[in-house]
Each structure stands twice: as C-alpha cells, then as structure tokens.
C-alpha cells in the first residue's frame, strides 16, 4: 500500500473519532448520551433523550465522517480493497473514538456514509430495507442488523468488486450490535416508540 492509503486510514480513524453525539449534546445542554437513554453516543439515542435538531446534526455529521474519507480515496483512484480499509477505519474511529476514551457508537450512520460514497444505488436499497424493517417492527437495532446482513448482496449486484470490503464493514456492524441481538432474542429490546 502507498503512503496515501496509510494517511487516509489515519485521517478516517481520527475523523471517525470525533463523537458528534457528545459534542452536539454538550452544545445543546442535553445529558451525556453515554450515560443516558441506551448509553450509545449516536443519533438514535440523542433523539431518544430529547434533542430532535441535535439528533439530525449528529446523523448528518456521522454520515459525513464515513463519506468524506471514502470520497477522497476515490479521488486518489485507490483499489477497492484499500477503499474498504479506509471505510473500516472511519467506522472503527466512531466505535472506538480516540478522543473519547474509546467509548463510541454503533457505527451505522458512519458506515452508511461510507457506503453512500461507494454506491448510491446500493445505499438507497439498504436505506429502504432499514425503513421497511423499522416500520414493521420498530427496532432500530434490528433494522441495522438485517440491513448489514443484506447490504453485501446489494453491493455485489451493483459493484461486485466492493463486495468483500463492504462485507467487512457489515460484519463489524453486526458485531457491534451483539448486545442488542441478545436482547432481541430474549424479548428484552424495546421498540423505539415505546421509549421516552
């Protein structure tokens, strides 16, 4: 790999490490999302603890965190495997942020941003899948897991050369939701509309 790839991996991780949920909550005077709600510093939990505009800001910033490094990678005409590593680094930064004691979010919005930069069509299909599952069952976590499991097939259909890198990112997302999966299995996960 070239020095450009290594630099973009570091940049992606550091950008991913900027926890917008914590920053937006501090600016809006909301409680720390790591200590309230689901204890997850992400857009869904910020919405859950009462900050609609902050949640939107978090969502957009987290999407940008994944999308920008991947767009730069495409600009440098890197290989799909290298672009996949950069996308993975952004997600790892969000999940294990250097600047916030490695206590991060689930990485869904950041992964979506990266995938959006790789394939708009596949990302649109993934978003539709997420929405359908959410509207049917009301679980954000279930929507994320099912979408992550299906997304590699969408990518294979539209851009097969990115199937393996995207599958790695999706595996990370599923792993990050292991606690949610256990609660879903036990019937202990509450739907979004049941939470205050």
Curated annotation (Swiss-Prot):
**Pathway it belongs to?**
Lipid metabolism; phospholipid metabolism
**EC numbers, comma separated:** 2.3.1.275
State if NADP is listed as a keyword. Answer: no
Q: Where in the cell is it found?
A: Cell inner membrane
- Catalytic activity entry: an acyl phosphate + sn-glycerol 3-phosphate = a 1-acyl-sn-glycero-3-phosphate + phosphate
Q: Which ranges does the record mark as transmembrane?
A: 5-25, 53-73, 80-100, 107-127, 130-150, 153-173
Q: Its topology with respect to the membrane?
A: Multi-pass membrane protein
Q: Which InterPro entries match?
A: G3P_acylTferase_PlsY (IPR003811)
The superkingdom of the source organism is: Bacteria
Molecular function per GO: acyl-phosphate glycerol-3-phosphate acyltransferase activity
Entry annotated with the keyword Cell inner membrane: yes
**A Gene Ontology term for the protein's cellular component:** plasma membrane
Going by the UniProt record, its keywords in alphabetical order are: Cell inner membrane, Cell membrane, Lipid biosynthesis, Lipid metabolism, Membrane, Phospholipid biosynthesis, Phospholipid metabolism, Transferase, Transmembrane, Transmembrane helix
Q: What class of enzyme is it?
A: transferase
- Any one Gene Ontology biological process term? phospholipid biosynthetic process
HAMAP family for the chain: PlsY
| PANTHER family noted in UniProt | GLYCEROL-3-PHOSPHATE ACYLTRANSFERASE-RELATED, INNER MEMBRANE PROTEIN YGIH
- Family of the protein in this entry: Belongs to the PlsY family.
The subunit field of the Swiss-Prot or TrEMBL record says: Probably interacts with PlsX.
Query: What NCBIfam families does the entry give?
Result: glycerol-3-phosphate 1-O-acyltransferase PlsY
Function noted in UniProt: Catalyzes the transfer of an acyl group from acyl-phosphate (acyl-PO(4)) to glycerol-3-phosphate (G3P) to form lysophosphatidic acid (LPA). This enzyme utilizes acyl-phosphate as fatty acyl donor, but not acyl-CoA or acyl-ACP.
Question: Could you tell me what this protein is called?
Answer: Glycerol-3-phosphate acyltransferase
